[in-house]
Amino acid sequence: MPAESGKRFKPSKYVPVSAAAIFLVGATTLFFAFTCPGLSLDVSPAVPIYNAIMFLFVLANFSMATFMDPGIFPRAEEDEDKEDDFRAPLYKTVEIKGIQVRMKWCATCRFYRPPRCSHCSVCDNCVEEFDHHCPWVNNCIGRRNYRYFFLFLLSLTAHIMGVFGFGLLYVLCHIEELSGVRTAVTMAVMCVAGLFFIPVAGLTGFHVVLVARGRTTNEQVTGKFRGGVNPFTNGCCNNVSRVLCSSPAPRYLGRPKKEKTIVIRPPFLRPEVSDGQITVKIMDNGIQGELRRTKSKGSLEITESQSADAEPPPPPKPDLSRYTGLRTHLSLATNEDSSLLGKDSPPTPTMYKYRPGYSSSSTSAAMPHSSSAKLSRGDSLKEPTSIADSSRHPSYRSEPSLEPESFRSPTFGKSFHFDPLSSGSRSSSLKSAQGTGFELGQLQSIRSEGTTSTSYKSLANQTRNGSLSYDSLLTPSDSPDFESVQAGPEPDPPLGYTSPFLSARLAQQREAERHPRLLPTGPPHREPSPVRYDNLSRHIVASLQEREKLLRQSPPLAGREEEPGLGDSGIQSTPGSGHAPRTSSSSDDSKRSPLSKTPLGRPAVPRFGKPDGLRGRGLGSPEPGTTAPYLGRSMSYSSQKAPSGVSETEEVALQPLLTPKDEVQLKTTYSKSNGQPKSIGSASPGPGQPPLSSPTRGGVKKVSGVGGTTYEISV
């Protein structure tokens, strides 16, 4: 019965015990109601007392045998003795009083059953000193409840005998009244008692024998000690006294207790925060401190929700009091920038000012699209740069060069100022810079390192249209601070700077306001210097060497003089411009533009040195004889015949650099300002060439730009 808790309810299991209880209680009740009153008057009043005591004793033992734990062994846990479960032998042998007794492995309970223990197939439990499973009490009979079962049998047998005997006595005393109700009920109770007396008396006698011999029903039925010696017997009297008078065996199963429900918070859940003092430890850039702040639960939740959507805070400012070297460096850099920036010059943004720059060397060819490919030029070999000169010619490049000293040219250090006006062709128009001691060989050396001053607006147009040719890969001048050269020590601030955070239109409008203040200057003569082929590809170096051989073999062509109009052609001396003369659009754009389709001719390579008598126009300044106002987008997208002032030997020397991988047929480039050729009077197109641009209507010229854009330029 106690083992049935927690299992499925089976009504059939309670039929025998219910029937036994009904017959026992019902028959005894009838006996006390109809027979005992007459017997108490006729025989003795002790008869009902005796029967009542016996009946209570029967009920007590019946209840104890039914509801008491028979001595169930608890089962092993699932993770206990797994090795024994798989590897254990079927039996183990122990010696009791010199006799070998086997202990069998129980696969259900997962342990070796002790001696005299057996597994009940009905209760599905291993019971200590298992006797049998009695259906009349609906429980196993084991060591702990065998006493009560045995006493139940004895008391029940005695009670049945008493009921039957006292009933027979009542009938004999009232034989004249056999037809009476009392006599009839007494006779019916005697029949029931007589029917139960035979099996109960037989079972009681059987167990008396077993107790006297010290055996169990299971041992007797299975014949374990048949023909042998029982090691568990202690003699008849000892066996009886052990069953009836010994102390009860301990209980192996704990008493069933109600399970308590405990709510356990997982470790990742934050405990509830009550209103109170919260110690907050702050760590800010190495500065530690403890603040005691009063925060409520609501304020913390609001802060959490805000911090989840907010941007991460900016890095803290450095503590200048702790780092004296950094403070000195920042103060010197601030003073230098304040002295370099003129009154009319735009301020350099802070993040741009201290951004590290990388000089273009071998990495320029490897990464032509890198925005860190910058070109810087050193001071002149002939004219030293002073603070006053640098204040008049600021470079707007404050970042240091990270290139090793072995790869630096002694002329590096000053950046080229960018002027979108003079960058009309595919490669930037070459213009000689006054006041800088560059020679032709030095420019070729810079050019051999793969650097060029391609127009920022031109490259922006290429990038916007998504067409980059092989030439643009060799000329990676895509950084915003790739500036053009400011010529000569002029009092006015230079105009080549374009802020990287401004659009091209705003930058051109700002330059248009400063444009008329530039004065024309003339460049000095330069001497050639040897050429470096360090970072060029193998086929370009081979073709360049072949061209130099041809240059040494063929004499320079005579009769080519610079025409006066060439002085204002807007030529700008930029290193690496001989790589590929290119229009401001890509090769695909030049093929699409109807204004740039001319027969293949030799590219116009301007001379780097000009006579001192010829004065070049100031950077981006208008023509000396023109009064047309400056237009923001005055870039030339057409090509023209090369000027006659350019020597053929220089063209031959620069031809190896004009071989793109995408097989773009390079057109002859002619620099133009405001859509008009600079030396249009001296250079006329060939007989088979189409017009340079669309016809001028009423002083307005239409020029096709990138992506099919048409620009109207007043002449």
From Swiss-Prot:
The active site is at 134 (s-palmitoyl cysteine intermediate). Residues 359-373, 422-432, 581-597 have a biased composition (Low complexity). The modification Omega-N-methylarginine is found at residues 617, 697. One of its GO terms (molecular function) is palmitoyltransferase activity. It is a multi-pass membrane protein. Keywords: Acyltransferase, Cell membrane, Immunity, Innate immunity, Lipid transport, Lipoprotein, Membrane, Methylation, Palmitate, Phosphoprotein, Transferase, Transmembrane, Transmembrane helix, Transport. Pfam families: DHHC. Its EC number is 2.3.1.225. It catalyses: L-cysteinyl-[protein] + hexadecanoyl-CoA = S-hexadecanoyl-L-cysteinyl-[protein] + CoA. Autopalmitoylated. Palmitoylation of the C-terminal tail regulates stimulation-dependent plasma membrane motility. Phosphorylation regulates association with endocytic proteins and its subcellular localization. Phosphorylation by LYN during fatty acid uptake leads to inactivation of the activity. The modification Phosphoserine is found at residues 247, 296, 299, 345, 380, 398, 406, 409, 415, 425, 429, 432, 529, 554, 621, 684, 694. Signal peptide: none annotated. It is found in: Cell membrane. Residues 1-13, 74-148, 213-715 are cytoplasmic. InterPro entries: Palmitoyltrfase_DHHC. The modification Phosphothreonine is found at residues 294, 303, 348, 350, 411, 436, 659. The chain crosses the membrane at residues 14-34, 53-73, 149-169, 192-212. GO terms for biological process: innate immune response; lipid transport; positive regulation of NLRP3 inflammasome complex assembly; positive regulation of pattern recognition receptor signaling pathway; positive regulation of protein localization to phagocytic vesicle; positive regulation of protein localization to plasma membrane; positive regulation of pyroptotic inflammatory response; protein localization to plasma membrane. Belongs to the DHHC palmitoyltransferase family. ERF2/ZDHHC9 subfamily. The DHHC domain is required for palmitoyltransferase activity. Palmitoyltransferase that catalyzes the addition of palmitate onto various protein substrates such as CTNND2, CD36, GSDMD, NLRP3, NOD1, NOD2, STAT3 and S1PR1 thus plays a role in various biological processes including cell adhesion, inflammation, fatty acid uptake, bacterial sensing or cardiac functions. Plays an important role in the regulation of synapse efficacy by mediating palmitoylation of delta-catenin/CTNND2, thereby increasing synaptic delivery and surface stabilization of alpha-amino-3-hydroxy-5-methyl-4-isoxazole propionic acid receptors (AMPARs). This is Palmitoyltransferase ZDHHC5.
